[in-house]
């Protein structure tokens, strides 16, 4: 994380296997709903950053599909094991962003590990995944079936709870996922619309009901294939 002007630490983007900052000046404070304290900040990205993240995912597609199903299974198994090993750290991230009880945060990490170990095949292609603020780690982990099918992905977490998705992508890099297979783009509507205009193959959604309509409307506006994950 980096300093964001004189405020809290800023969580950078994760694009092409590394953390990167954006030159944009719009920042969103991630406030713990229990304490009311701003834990950190995220940039509110637009079309330029969306296109950059999607290009990284597109460039990674050949090497990721080239691993074959068994190779991708191995990588996801490594990520699940690593997440299990860092379960305490991820639980703390969830507690800080969402203000949930420790038991609830720990249960979410366990559920995310189970999802990463599943053998179901999902959507293929170069995808965007919009994640809500409720159970953000579990929602981000729901990308696993698509990854297993050979998809490369740009995750757009809620600016209210972005830490877990960023940390998951960083952990995937430590597990030697090819650069660009998993990327994180921060922001809200303009970031999602940027993925659509940049030609994402499909937009996946894993979030709360209140966000479903607006995200689906953005996808429909640009004739982008839209999939709701259970």
Predicted feature descriptions by range:
Residues 1-123:
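N-terminal Rossmann-like NAD(P)+-binding subdomain of aldehyde/semialdehyde dehydrogenases
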Residues 121-230:
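Rossmann-like NAD(P) dinucleotide-binding subdomain of oxidoreductase/dehydrogenase enzymes
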């Amino acid at each position: 994380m980096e300093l964001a002007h004189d405020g809290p630490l800023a969580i950078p983007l994760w694009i092409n296997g590394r953390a990167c900052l954006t030159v944009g000046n719009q920042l969103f404070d991630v406030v713990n709903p229990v304490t009311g304290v701003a834990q950190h900040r995220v940039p509110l990205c637009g079309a330029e950053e969306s296109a950059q993240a999607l290009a990284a995912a597109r460039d990674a597609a050949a090497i990721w599909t080239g691993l074959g199903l068994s190779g991708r299974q191995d990588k996801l198994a490594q990520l699940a094991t690593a997440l299990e090993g860092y379960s305490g750290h991820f639980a703390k991230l969830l507690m800080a962003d969402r203000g949930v009880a420790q038991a609830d945060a720990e249960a979410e990490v366990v559920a995310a590990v189970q999802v990463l170990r599943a053998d179901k095949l999902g959507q293929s292609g170069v995808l965007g995944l919009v994640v809500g603020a409720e159970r953000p780690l579990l929602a981000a982990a729901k990308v696993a079936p698509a990854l297993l099918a050979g998809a490369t992905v740009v995750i757009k977490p809620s600016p209210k709870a972005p830490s877990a998705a960023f940390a998951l992508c960083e952990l995937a890099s430590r597990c030697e996922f090819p650069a660009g297979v998993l990327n994180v783009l921060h922001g809200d509507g303009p970031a999602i619309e940027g993925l659509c205009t940049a030609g994402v193959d499909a937009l996946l959604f894993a979030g709360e009901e209140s966000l479903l309509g607006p995200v689906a409307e953005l996808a429909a506006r640009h004739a982008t294939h839209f999939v709701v994950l259970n």
